[in-house]
A protein has these predicted regions:
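Hydrophobic, amphipathic alpha-helical faces that serve as interaction scaffolds
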Residues: 82-93, 116-156, 185-190, 200
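Amphipathic alpha-helix face/heptad-repeat signature
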Residues: 75-82, 110, 133, 151, ...
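Short, hydrophobic secondary-structure boundary micro-motifs
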Residues: 25-27, 61, 130-134, 173-174
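A ubiquitous short alpha-helical element
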Residues: 1, 49, 71-75, 104-105, ...
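All-alpha effector-binding/dimerization core of bacterial HTH-type transcriptional repressors
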Residues: 69-126, 164-175
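C-terminal all-alpha effector/ligand-binding and dimerization domain
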Residues: 147-201
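Short linear motifs at protein or domain termini
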Residues: 1-93, 193-201
Length: 201
């Protein structure tokens, strides 16, 4: 096992690169090459890749090695369906008090802002497993969320509604969640097509 002071930054850097689409979906990830690029030994890279296999961002095939997890229309639809169910389940009960400072945090990108507001919604649940599952789904969807402003017809409006609903009534949160996810589901084919196009360039 790698020392924490080496493993943690290696893991975070690799995870962020995967979430940002640095490598095309399905591309082989060579631990030796990544170790050279990151300036670390193979051990923290392998440990990080194995952790990311558990999180669903990397696939491991015995005898073949690591690859960026493939994302299909079917798997994207499944993740979106589970995501909205999880978030709706914490929208109905009275959530724990949301700190308005969380909503004002400096988040750079559209994809980060979507993930951030969903994390805030999940704070309404005392169920730690539910929150962790939501975070895992959010991390896997990040690569697609980067594309939403260019693919979804009303992406920015949907995001503004989500952010505004964080401090609104449960019914408003559910309404915002459904509108956002309905828009995503209606454009799954296009999102996957654009993702594939990016990987081929």
């Amino acid at each position: 096992m790698s020392p924490a002071h080496v493993l943690e930054p290696t893991y975070r850097r690799l995870k962020r690169a995967l979430m940002e689409g640095t490598w095309p979906i399905g591309q082989k990830l060579e631990a030796m090459r990544l170790a050279d690029e990151f300036g670390v030994s193979m051990t923290p890279v392998r440990d990080s890749l194995n952790q990311l296999v558990g999180e669903g961002l990397v696939d491991l095939t015995p005898g073949e090695g690591y690859r960026v997890t493939l994302l299909t229309e079917h798997s994207l639809r499944d993740m979106l369906a589970v995501n909205v169910l999880l978030l709706e389940s914490v929208a109905d009960p009275a959530p724990r008090k949301i700190d308005t400072a969380d909503l004002a945090a400096p988040i750079d990108t559209y994809a980060d802002r979507v993930g951030d507001v969903f994390s805030i919604f999940a704070l309404g649940s005392e169920n730690r497993f539910l929150r962790q599952t939501g975070d895992l789904i959010s991390d896997r969807l990040h690569i697609v969320r980067r594309l939403e402003p260019d693919v979804l017809p009303n992406a920015l409006e949907a995001l503004a509604e989500l952010e505004g609903s964080a401090l609104a009534t449960p019914s408003k949160r559910v309404q915002a969640l459904r509108r956002y996810h309905d828009q995503c589901l209606a454009n799954v084919s296009r999102l996957i097509a654009v993702l594939a196009e990016q990987g081929s360039t």
